[in-house]
Amino acid sequence: MPIGDSAPPTPSPPPERLTGLGPVADARTVVLVLGSFPGVASLRAQQYYAHPHNQFWPVLQALWPQHPLPGRDDYAARCAWLLARGLGLWDVYAACERAGSLDARIRNAALNDFAALRARCPRLAAIAHNGGESFRHAKAVRAVLGDGLPSLRLPSTSPANASWRFERKCNAWAEALAPFGLVDTIGPQENCCG
C-alpha cells in the first residue's frame, strides 16, 4: 500500500438503546429526587446509584445520622429506608442511547411518564434534581407533576462532579430538604457533614 493511503476508518456502531429503572416512590414521598439516567454500574446492578464512588447514599446518611443506612448488599432495605424518610427516586429519562455513563453522551432520550407517577405520590411537595442534566428538564417535569411544585437544583452526587467537596454537597442537600421537614440536620450552619 502506498504511503498516505489507508483503509477508510470503520464507523463505530451506534450506541444501543438503553432502558432506565422504575421509580422508587410511594404515598409517603414528599420530595422526588430525579437523576438524569442510570450509569452503567446502576443498569448492570438494576439499582439506583450503584457506582461505588457515587456519593448519593453517603450524602443521605449524613442527613439522617440517627438512622443507619442499610449496607450496599441490601438494596431493598436501602429503598425502604429512603421511602421512610419521605424521599422517592427516579430519573428524567425513561430510555436513551448512550456510550458509557456520562450525561454529555446521552442521545435520543425519551422522558419518563410523570403523569402516572403523580397518582402514586399524593403528598409530593417538591422535585429535587440531582445535577444539571436533570434540571434542564425541570419545566417539562413540573408541567406534568404540577406547576406549583418547587424544582430544587442540587449538586450532582456523581463522581464526575469532583469540583464539589463531599461536605459542600451534604450542606447543599440539607439546606434544600430541610424546609420539607425531611432531615435530622438543619443545614450549613450546623455543618452536617463536616
Whereabouts are the PLM-identified features?
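C-terminal capping/extension of enzyme domains
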Residues: M1-V30, H51-P52, G100-A115, K139-G194
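Gly/Ser/Thr-rich beta-alpha loop segments that engage phosphate groups in nucleotides
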Residues: F37, A41, E133
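Short, histidine-centered active-site or binding-site loop motifs used for metal coordination
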Residues: F37-P38, Y93-C96, P155-S158
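Hydrophobic packing residues within well-ordered alpha-helices of enzyme cores
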Residues: L60, H137-A138
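Short, surface-exposed acidic-centric catalytic microdomains
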Residues: A41-R105
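A broad structural signal for alpha-helix termini and local helix breaks/kinks
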Residues: W64-P65, C121, R142-L145
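Internal catalytic-core helix/loop-beta-alpha segment
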Residues: A84-S134
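N-terminal nucleotide-binding beta1-loop-alpha1 segment
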Residues: L32-S36
